[in-house]
């Protein structure tokens, strides 16, 4: 019988492959938390949302379902999903505060921002619950989280392209997301090989498509961000010269 993966067990045998997977889980947990805190800071500093409406509402819906409705199926994260729920709630509050600056060109949306965010969050929450009812909470936890990660990475790219500037974004937000995603994928591969946490979903071609796509988005992001920064610099200098004249 395998020894439970406690902190003491990890220190006794730090090179055990499952112990390494636990360390990767901690890296992912801390990384995502830093990502959310970074979004709060950047959104407040730049007075513009740091995350799109779809990934934010999907994340909150997923976290609510598995933190409060099916907590047993996120128990291997030892309460981290609840921490993420509260951190994302802070992201939502700041986003609602600064969203009018980003929705100024959409009068209808500008007038109903709070309703839109609440409605989309409820829809994603209902969808996550329906997915859990359809395929079971164990697989639903993984596949629902996969959708969250896909939206987070893809919408980060889309946000840069649609805005044409880097306000609301930062290397810290990207790095925390990328390292957490990569660590999480390696952890899942290890646990799949050892049949831990019920992860049969990794033998799915769709799962590998999702993994490759998300990693590709995260790998491309810093290059796009850097290109945007280079385009912004001359424009900012020109604006500064005009103000000083």
From Swiss-Prot:
Q: Name one GO cellular component term.
A: membrane
Give UniProt keywords alphabetically: Lyase, Membrane, Transmembrane, Transmembrane helix
Q: Which GO terms describe its molecular function?
A: lyase activity
EC class (word): lyase
Does the record's keyword annotation contain Transmembrane? Answer: yes
**Localization of this protein:** Membrane
Q: Which InterPro entries match?
A: PaxB-like (IPR039020)
Q: Which domain of life is it from?
A: Eukaryota
Where would you find the membrane-spanning parts of this chain? 17-37, 51-71, 76-96, 113-133, 138-158, 170-190, 205-225
Q: What is its EC number?
A: 4.2.3.-
Pathway(s) served: Secondary metabolite biosynthesis; terpenoid biosynthesis
Has UniProt tagged this entry with the keyword Lyase?
yes
Topology relative to the lipid bilayer, per the entry, is: Multi-pass membrane protein
Q: Which GO terms describe its biological process?
A: terpenoid biosynthetic process
The similarity annotation says: Belongs to the paxB family.
The protein's name: Terpene cyclase prhH
Q: Which species is the source of this protein?
A: Penicillium brasilianum
Its organism's taxonomic lineage begins at: Eukaryota, Fungi, Dikarya, Ascomycota, Pezizomycotina
């Amino acid at each position: 019988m395998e020894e439970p993966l406690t902190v003491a067990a990890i220190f006794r045998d730090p090179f055990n492959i499952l112990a390494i997977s636990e360390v990767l889980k901690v890296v992912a947990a801390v990384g995502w938390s830093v990502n959310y805190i970074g979004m709060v800071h950047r959104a407040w500093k730049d007075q513009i949302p740091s995350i799109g409406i779809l990934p934010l509402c999907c994340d909150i819906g997923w976290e609510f379902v598995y933190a409060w409705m099916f907590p047993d199926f996120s128990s291997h994260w030892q309460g981290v999903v609840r921490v993420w729920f509260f951190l994302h709630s802070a992201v939502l509050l700041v986003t609602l505060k600064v969203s009018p600056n980003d929705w100024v060109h959409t009068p209808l949306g500008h007038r109903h921002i709070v309703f839109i965010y609440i409605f989309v969050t409820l829809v994603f929450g209902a969808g996550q619950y329906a997915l859990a009812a359809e395929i079971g909470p164990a697989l639903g936890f993984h596949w629902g989280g996969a959708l969250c990660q896909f939206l987070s990475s893809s919408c980060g790219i889309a946000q840069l392209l649609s805005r044409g500037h880097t306000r609301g974004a930062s290397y810290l937000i990207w790095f925390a997301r990328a390292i957490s995603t990569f660590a999480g994928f390696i952890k899942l591969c290890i646990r799949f090989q050892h049949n831990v946490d019920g992860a049969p979903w990794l033998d799915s071609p769709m799962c590998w498509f999702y993994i490759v796509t998300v990693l590709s988005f995260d790998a491309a992001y810093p290059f796009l961000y850097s290109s945007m920064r280079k385009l912004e610099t001359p424009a900012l200098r020109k604006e500064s010269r005009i103000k000083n004249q």
